[in-house]
C-alpha cells in the first residue's frame, strides 16, 4: 500500500497550522500511518489463515472468523486515518485556493506595516516659556522643528508566533476551527466504534455456534497477546490525537480572547492620545493657558496646582532679583542715550529673564497666601 500521496498532502498542512497542529501531524504520521503500515500489516497478515477451529465442516471457519472480526483491525485503522485526515485535506485545499487569490493583498499589507510611522510627539521649545513672558504683543510661533532620531528598523516589532496570526491574517480561522471540530468528532466516533467492535483485548479463543457449523465450535486466534498490545497502542494514539485537538481549540480560544483584549486596550490608548496633526518633520504644540491675572503658567517654574515653593527658595529669588535690578539700574544710569534706553531696557534678554523670575515669584507668593487663608479657615 502506497502512503506517499497522503503524506505529501499532510506535509502541506504543516505550513498552514499552529504549533499544536504540527505536533498532531507528527503524531499522525509516525504513530498512525507508519505504525499501521509497518507494524499492523506484519502482525495481522495471517490473521485469517491462522484462525483455526476444531471442525472439518467446510465454510465453518470463515463464518466463525466473520463473527470474531466483522471488520479487520488494519482496515478499520486505515479507514480511521483516511476519514480523520479528510477535514485537514479539505482545509488545505481551501487555504491554497484562498491564498492564491490574495497575493496582492498580502504585498499591500506588508508594505503598509513597513511604512507605518509613529505620530509626531508634542514638543515645546526650551525658550518658549520666557518668550511668552515678554509681553511684547508679538505672536509666538506655535510649531517648532525638531530632528527625529533614527531608530532601528522594525526592532522588536516582530513577534514570535506559532502560525495562529498567519491563519487569522489569511482569513482562514473559521475554516481551521471547523476542521478541528470535525476531527474531534471523528476521533470520538472511532474510539467508540473500536471499543464496540474489539473491546480492550484480543481473546485467545472464540466460541462459535453459527451455521453451517454442526455444533458449538472452539476457534483459536494467532498471537493474541501481541495483537492486544498493538490494539492498546492504537487506543492511546487515538486518545492523544483527541487531546491535541482539544488543546488546539483551547489555544485558539485563549489566543483570540487575548488578541481582542489587546486590541481594545490599544484602541483606548489611541483615543486618549489624539493630538493635532503637524507637517512632516515638525511637532505641534498647544498654546499654554494663563492665570486670571494674565500671568503665564510655566511647566518647570515650580508654580502649579498643589505645589508651593519653600520659604528659603522665595528668599533666594528675592535676593537674586534685587541684585539683578541693581545691575540694570546701574547700566541705565551709565547709558548716555535718551529715549532708546527705555526701549532697549525693556526688550533686553536680561530684562526678559528678570520679568519671568518676577512673575514666578509673584505667583509663588500668591499661592502661599491662598494656602494660608485656606488653612486659617
Curated annotation (Swiss-Prot):
Chain spans, region Disordered: 129-163, 265-294, 334-377
Biased composition regions of type Polar residues, renumbered to the chain: 337-362
Subunit text: A connexon is composed of a hexamer of connexins.
Membrane recorded as keyword: yes
Extracellular compartment spans: 40-75, 198-228
Cytoplasmic side: 1-18, 97-174, 250-377
Gene from which the chain derives: gjc1
GO annotation terms (biological process): cell communication
Name of the protein described by the UniProt record: Gap junction gamma-1 protein
Membrane-spanning ranges: 19-39, 76-96, 175-197, 229-249
One cellular-component annotation, GO: connexin complex
Membrane topology classification: Multi-pass membrane protein
Family to which the UniProt record says this protein belongs: Belongs to the connexin family. Gamma-type subfamily.
Key words of the record: Cell junction, Cell membrane, Gap junction, Membrane, Transmembrane, Transmembrane helix
Coiled coil: none
Localization of this protein: Cell membrane; Cell junction, Gap junction
Biased composition regions of type Acidic residues, renumbered to the chain: 131-151
Pfam families: Connexin
Main location: membrane
Highest rank taxon of the organism: Eukaryota
Biological function: One gap junction consists of a cluster of closely packed pairs of transmembrane channels, the connexons, through which materials of low MW diffuse from one cell to a neighboring cell.
